[in-house]
Amino acid sequence: MYTCAKFVSTPSLIRRTSTVLSRSLSAVVVRRPETLTDESHSSLAVVPRPLTTSLTPSRSFQTSAISRDIDTAAKFIGAGAATVGVAGSGAGIGTVFGSLIIGYARNPSLKQQLFSYAILGFALSEAMGLFCLMVAFLILFAM
């Protein structure tokens, strides 16, 4: 039993099996047939075969294309998340002027002070919206 386990789990067999399993199916099928020597016919030991690397450049090209697609998707997701801030700016402006109307209805004597606060709130909200829009354009076109 021990000799059988020793034969099945030789380091060269493990190394060769792990590299074959990690390669694509087309790379395994397209391999060139290796010639066996007289030594390998006579003994039961596993002879390590050289691995072909004919498909390695095409695999790295596919990986770079996938990497570019992931980068492009990340750009669009980031720009979309930054654009949400523009919608938040619109909601903020609506809240500011809604509060102005409610405040004026409650106390008409503070009309001038409420209006100046409303303009300040509008300016801050609009500035944040423009900042978010600028970040979205930077993500799309500068990165």
Swiss-Prot record:
GO terms for biological process: proton motive force-driven ATP synthesis. It is found in: Mitochondrion membrane. Disulfide bonds: none annotated. Trimethylated by ATPSCKMT at Lys-111. Methylation is required for proper incorporation of the C subunit into the ATP synthase complex and mitochondrial respiration. One of its GO terms (molecular function) is proton transmembrane transporter activity. InterPro entries: ATP_synth_F0_csu, ATP_synth_F0_csu_DDCD_BS, ATP_synth_F0_csu_sf, ATPase_proteolipid_c-like_dom, F/V-ATP_Csub_sf. SUPFAM superfamilies: F1F0 ATP synthase subunit C. It is a multi-pass membrane protein. GO terms for cellular component: mitochondrial membrane; mitochondrion; proton-transporting ATP synthase complex; proton-transporting two-sector ATPase complex, proton-transporting domain. Residues 1-68 form a transit peptide. Gene3D superfamilies: F1F0 ATP synthase subunit C (1.20.20.10). It is linked to This protein is the major protein stored in the storage bodies of animals or humans affected with ceroid lipofuscinosis (Batten disease). F-type ATPases have 2 components, CF(1) - the catalytic core - and CF(0) - the membrane proton channel. CF(1) has five subunits: alpha(3), beta(3), gamma(1), delta(1), epsilon(1). CF(0) has three main subunits: a, b and c. Interacts with DNAJC30; interaction is direct. PANTHER family: ATP SYNTHASE LIPID-BINDING PROTEIN, MITOCHONDRIAL, ATPASE PROTEIN 9. There are three genes which encode the ATP synthase proteolipid and they specify precursors with different import sequences but identical mature proteins. Mitochondrial membrane ATP synthase (F(1)F(0) ATP synthase or Complex V) produces ATP from ADP in the presence of a proton gradient across the membrane which is generated by electron transport complexes of the respiratory chain. F-type ATPases consist of two structural domains, F(1) - containing the extramembraneous catalytic core and F(0) - containing the membrane proton channel, linked together by a central stalk and a peripheral stalk. During catalysis, ATP synthesis in the catalytic domain of F(1) is coupled via a rotary mechanism of the central stalk subunits to proton translocation. This is ATP synthase F(0) complex subunit C2, mitochondrial. It comes from Bos taurus (Bovine). The lineage of its organism: Eukaryota, Metazoa, Chordata, Craniata, Vertebrata. The gene is ATP5MC2.
